[in-house]
Each structure stands twice: as structure tokens, then as C-alpha cells.
Amino acid sequence: MPLELTQSRVQKIWIPVDHRPSLPRTCGPKLTNSPTVIVMVGLPARGKTYISKKLTRYLNWIGVPTKVFNLGEYRRDGVKQYSSYNFFRPDNEEAMKVRKQCALAALRDVKSYLTKEGGQIAVFDATNTTRERRHMILHFPKENDFKVFFIESVCDDPTVVASNIMEVKISSPDYKDCNSRENAMDDFMKRINCYEASYQPLDPDNDDRDLSLIKVIDVGQRFLVNRVQDHIQRRIVYYLMNIHWQPRTIYLCRHGESKHNLQGKIGGDSGLSSRGRKFANALSKFVEEQNLKDLKVWTSQLKSTIQTAEALQLPYEQWKALNEIDAGVCEEMTYEEIKDTYPEEYALAEADKYYYRYPTGESYQDLVQRLEPVIMELERQENVLVICHQAVCVCLLAYFLDKSAEEMPYLKCPLHAVLKLTPIAYGCRVESIYLNVESVSTHRERSEDAKKGPNPLMRSNSH
């Protein structure tokens, strides 16, 4: 029997299929030369879990398989009923044993994730406030040849701490049976006091001079960075230096309906249809009603987004990075035309929409890399309206909603709707606002071929 063939992502050559176990297809290229354990450090209510989840979302979005291991969840699995802050007293020897066992269980799962499940980065989300605990954790990656990077969140502003407790902590499962918010707040403050007595901050000038770390001070007002080891740690540092905790709103919308939308064509640079111009006027009215202070407006460099923004009568910035995905030889063709002219390309695109790259064009994976500077700048901003294109919109939305590479191309971003994104404690709230202007639908559902996975005779021509 002939060998099954597949095509190398790097070179367009047919090679025998390798049936040995491999990393999940969502991983793409490995961006780390050895697995990394990120160890969070800091008192409770300092934003460690916020940083852990946000950083994990970013790393997964850029193609680095990452998972959070939250010690609080392990503790709640091991101790079904939370009684009070007394569990966290340093002189509660029985509880200390339980907490250590929970930490060891979490580290065992970290090892499994990084060695057997295709993970590249594990985030160990716990207080880790003593040197003794951190030395125990350091022994684990040394045994397994993992790199370690510490992230310490330091905040002495009582207003920020109280806000974090009220927004996140008192609604945690620990306090589901608590009879009042005040009692929960009081218990949590006493829990913090238990940790404060033995807290030993990271000290890169003395005891911790050899550790790779970043200290995030006062929710990003200052940073201290020490001994960054590699490319991925530099990206982590850069990301953490760009995010902020201030309330803001991000609006995503596509341009008004274009002439190519009406014709069912992809790509190109056509202007707005009459309904597209009507949407642009409706968007202008919507933005005015929002009464947003210092709203920034971003567009691509293509006609449809610029014509949509012109109706707002507001300053706007053009980003080449926001241009629609490049369909290469398939630009300005309908899907039916692509199917007739390039049947193999059509089948490959349907089977593997994220990794598939149009000949001389781009894949969604390429688009994510192109959009990374946009994400960094969005994280720095306050209120922003991004007027973009379908593939660009779904890539940005996937970042904020923590969607996988497989889900990304099939997210719905309809014409003539505004997606209002409001960052919240551990995620993002999304509201879809339709502006009552009719348009064609350009959404394509996942094909049956895509649901089955790639064809054995598969050319996945991305890097």
C-alpha cells in the first residue's frame, strides 16, 4: 500500500504522514526552547489571578499553549467547606500540611501538562510569599529541566486592595454561605493579615539576584525586571508593561457594507454600498450617544473603513495592520469562483481555516502575528473604536474572549453591528448592538470537512 502523504508547513514538498503522537494542531510553531513555569508571588487581592488569566489568554492567542494552575481551586477541591481565615494562620499546622499537599498536587499537574499534554508554559497561581515555599517550587523545575520566571504583584494602596476584594474575592466560592458582604470583607482582610506576618518579597538585589523575575508595582505604575532569560520571557515582560487596570470600553465593528460584500467577493478595496453609507451615519449617531471622553478611532488603510470613519467627523488613525486578510491569488473572487478555479485550495481552506494560507496570501495564523502590535496598543489605551474587516475583527474578538485557534475563524462579527467590549475582573463582557441597517450576511459556518479534521492528503502551507 502506498504511504499516506502530507505537505510540510515550511516547504511545499510532499512527505509521508508521521502517525506518532504530536502536539495539538492549535500549537503551531514552538516559541519556547524548553517549557517554562511562571510562578506568581504576592499577598492576596493584589491581582495575581488577574495577571495569570490575562497573560495566559495572550500567550494562547499568539500560539503558545499555556494553562493556569490556581492553587485556590486545588485547596477548595481538597477542603470542601471553608470555615474562616483561621485556615491560613501560620501556626495552624494541620492546615499548613493540607496547603503544602495541594501545592504538590498542582505541581504534579504542571509536570503532566508540560511533558505529556503539549503545554509550553504553566502559570502557578498562588501567593508563594515565603522563601521556603519558593525554594520548594524551584526544586521542581530543576528536576524536570523547566525554566522558571517569577511575577510578583506588589500593591500597598488600600483603595485598590479593597476594590479588588469587593469586586472578586467576596464573590468567590469561599464565601457562598457568608451572610453578608461586610463579614466576608472582614474575614478576607484577616486572611491577608495572616500572610503579611510571614511575607518575604522577592529581593533581586540580594537573596534573589539569580532569579528571572518581574515585579509589577502598584498595578503597573512601576516595574522591576531581573535576569530575563529568553525570547518568550521578554514578550511576557513587554506585555505586562503594556496592560493597565483602568476601566475602559473597546468597540469593534466592521466597515459598512461594501460593494464587494454585495457581490460575495473576498478581499479587494471596494467602497461602501448605499446601505454601507447608511450604516456609517448610524454609527456616527451611536458614537455621539455614547458620550465617550477622548474616544480614539482606528481604521485600516482600505476604502471601506475610511469611508465609514469619515461619517463620524472625528479624528481617526489608519493602521496598515488592520487591513483585511490577504487572500493572495483569490483576491476579489467569490467562494464559488475559488471552488471552480482552485478546487484544491478551496478544499484545504475549508478543512483547516486557521492554518491554511492562500497562495501568495495570508493565513489566520499570519494575521494574528500581524495584529499583535494592535493588541499591545489596545491594552495601553482607554476608550477605542476599531473599524476593521471580518477576519481582523474575529482575530481581535478571539483575543478578548479567549477563543482557541480552531474557534477563531468561525466567530460571528456581522456587518452593521457594534461589539461593545468591557474588560471585567477575569475576562471581558461583550454586548452586540445592532444599528438597524440591513446588510448581506458574510458569515460562513464551519464546514463538515473542518469538523472531521484535516484530510490525510493534506497540504497545510503555513510556517
UniProtKB/Swiss-Prot annotation:
BP-aspect Gene Ontology terms: fructose 2,6-bisphosphate metabolic process; fructose metabolic process
InterPro entries listed in its UniProt record: 6Pfruct_kin, 6Phosfructo_kin, His_Pase_superF_clade-1, His_PPase_superfam, P-loop_NTPase, PG/BPGM_mutase_AS
Gene Ontology cellular component list: cytosol
Region entry 6-phosphofructo-2-kinase, spans: 1-246
Family that this chain belongs to: In the C-terminal section; belongs to the phosphoglycerate mutase family.
Positions of the record's site feature: Transition state stabilizer: R254, N261, H389
UniProt-recorded Gene Ontology molecular function terms: 6-phosphofructo-2-kinase activity; ATP binding; fructose-2,6-bisphosphate 2-phosphatase activity
Binding positions (ATP): 42-50, 164-169, 346-349, 390-394, 426
Post-translational modification: Phosphorylation by AMPK stimulates activity.
Positions bearing Phosphoserine: S462
Residues at which beta-D-fructose 6-phosphate binds: R75, R99, T127, R133, K169, R191, Y195
Organism expressing this protein natively: Bos taurus (Bovine)
Record text on subunit structure and interactions: Homodimer. Forms a heterodimer with PFKFB2.
Positions of the UniProt region annotated as Fructose-2,6-bisphosphatase: 247-463
Protein EC: 2.7.1.105, 3.1.3.46
Keywords: ATP-binding, Hydrolase, Kinase, Multifunctional enzyme, Nucleotide-binding, Phosphoprotein, Transferase
SMART domains: PGAM
Tissue expr: Brain.
Name of the protein in question: 6-phosphofructo-2-kinase/fructose-2,6-bisphosphatase 3
Region (Disordered): 444-463
SUPFAM superfamilies from the UniProt entry: P-loop containing nucleoside triphosphate hydrolases (SSF52540), Phosphoglycerate mutase-like (SSF53254)
Catalytic activities: beta-D-fructose 2,6-bisphosphate + H2O = beta-D-fructose 6-phosphate + phosphate; beta-D-fructose 6-phosphate + ATP = beta-D-fructose 2,6-bisphosphate + ADP + H(+)
